[in-house]
C-alpha cells in the first residue's frame, strides 16, 4: 500500500487503521512528536504531510511559527493593498489562496473578508500571498 499520496493526519490514521490519538507523527524540523492538538491543527490549517524515504513528517505549532517568521525575514518581496493584489491577479481576494503570515493556516473566506474590511496589507513572500488569520490578528506581532 502506497501511503505517500496521503496528505492529512486524519487520512493517514484511516489508511493505517490506527486511532487518531494513537498515531505518532514527528515534526519535520524539531523531530518531537506532535500532540493530539497539534495533529488536529495541522489538518485544520490544511498543511500537508511530508514523505521522505517512506517516513512521514508533519510540523508542530512552534516550528510552524518559527518557519513562518524565518520565511518572512528571508524571502519577503513586497506588500500590497488588497485592491492591488486583486488587480495584479485579476480576481477577487476571496478566490486567491492566502496563508497566514504568522502561523501558516490557510485563510478562510471570512478571514479574507476581515483583511479587506480592516484595510490590512497582503504580503508577497516566496511568490505566495500572505495575511494574518483571525487568531493571529488578535495578537500584536
From Swiss-Prot:
Molecular function GO labels: DNA binding; zinc ion binding
GO annotation (BP), single: symbiont-mediated suppression of host type I interferon-mediated signaling pathway
Predominant place of localization: host cell
Superkingdom in the source lineage: Viruses
Gene3D superfamilies: E6 early regulatory protein (3.30.240.40)
SUPFAM superfamilies for the chain: E6 C-terminal domain-like
UniProt subunit comment: Forms homodimers. Interacts with ubiquitin-protein ligase UBE3A/E6-AP; this interaction stimulates UBE3A ubiquitin activity. Interacts with host BAK1.
Protein family per UniProt: Belongs to the papillomaviridae E6 protein family.
Name of the protein: Protein E6
